[in-house]
C-alpha cells in the first residue's frame, strides 16, 4: 500500500462538478493499493499517518500529529501510484490491485482512520476526480507499507 501524504490548510475533491469531500487543516492522502496488500498494510499505515508528527508546535517545530491537532484527512484512491514507467511511453498499471479488491481495502483503510477518531472525507472510488489543495510547507511524503 502506497500513500502520497501532503500537509494541507484545505483540500477538496470534485466529481462531475459536485464536491464529494472537503477538509480544512489536515492531510491530503492519495491512496494506492497493490494486489499484495492486506488489512495489515492498511492498519500499519492508518496508525502511522495519524501519529506522524508533521504539524508545527508553538515553536514552529514539526512536533505534532494529526491526532494532536484535531486535523482531518481527505482520502482519495489513486491506482496510478503503482504505474510503472521503465518501458515505453505509456505507464503500465499491472502492479495496481484490481478494482474489486482495491475498493474493499480502501474502504477498510478509511474505516480504520475513523476508528482512530479522525474525520475522513473521501472522493468516489474509480471516478474521474478533480482534486484541489493548498499544500502547507510544502510538506509532501511518500509512505509505503512494504518499505
Curated annotation (Swiss-Prot):
It catalyses: glycyl-tRNA(Ala) + H2O = tRNA(Ala) + glycine + H(+); a D-aminoacyl-tRNA + H2O = a tRNA + a D-alpha-amino acid + H(+). An aminoacyl-tRNA editing enzyme that deacylates mischarged D-aminoacyl-tRNAs. Also deacylates mischarged glycyl-tRNA(Ala), protecting cells against glycine mischarging by AlaRS. Acts via tRNA-based rather than protein-based catalysis; rejects L-amino acids rather than detecting D-amino acids in the active site. By recycling D-aminoacyl-tRNA to D-amino acids and free tRNA molecules, this enzyme counteracts the toxicity associated with the formation of D-aminoacyl-tRNA entities in vivo and helps enforce protein L-homochirality. The gene is dtd. The lineage of its organism: Bacteria, Bacillati, Bacillota, Bacilli, Bacillales. GO terms for biological process: D-amino acid catabolic process. InterPro entries: Daa-tRNA_deacyls_DTD, DTD-like_sf. It comes from the Bacteria. GO terms for cellular component: cytoplasm. Keywords: Cytoplasm, Hydrolase, RNA-binding, tRNA-binding. It comes from Bacillus velezensis (strain DSM 23117 / BGSC 10A6 / LMG 26770 / FZB42). It is an enzyme of class 3 (hydrolase). This is D-aminoacyl-tRNA deacylase. One of its GO terms (molecular function) is D-tyrosyl-tRNA(Tyr) deacylase activity. A motif (Gly-cisPro motif, important for rejection of L-amino acids) lies at residues 137-138. It is found in: Cytoplasm. Its main location: cytoplasm. A Gly-cisPro motif from one monomer fits into the active site of the other monomer to allow specific chiral rejection of L-amino acids. Its EC number is 3.1.1.96.
Amino acid at each position: 500500500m502506497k500513500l502520497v501524504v501532503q500537509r494541507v490548510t484545505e483540500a477538496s475533491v470534485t466529481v462531475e462538478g459536485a464536491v464529494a469531500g472537503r477538509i480544512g487543516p489536515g492531510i491530503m492522502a492519495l491512496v494506492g493499493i497493490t494486489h499484495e496488500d492486506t488489512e495489515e498494510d492498511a492498519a500499519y499505515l492508518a496508525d502511522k499517518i495519524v501519529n506522524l508528527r508533521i504539524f508545527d508546535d508553538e515553536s514552529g517545530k514539526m512536533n505534532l500529529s494529526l491526532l494532536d491537532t484535531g486535523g482531518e484527512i481527505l482520502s482519495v484512491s489513486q491506482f496510478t501510484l503503482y504505474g510503472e514507467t521503465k518501458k515505453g511511453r505509456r505507464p503500465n498499471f499491472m502492479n495496481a490491485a484490481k478494482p474489486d479488491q482495491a475498493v474493499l481495502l480502501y474502504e477498510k483503510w478509511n474505516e480504520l482512520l475513523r476508528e482512530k477518531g479522525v474525520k475522513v472525507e473521501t472522493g468516489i472510488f474509480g471516478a474521474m476526480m478533480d482534486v484541489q489543495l493548498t499544500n502547507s510547507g510544502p510538506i509532501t511524503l511518500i509512505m509505503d507499507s512494504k518499505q
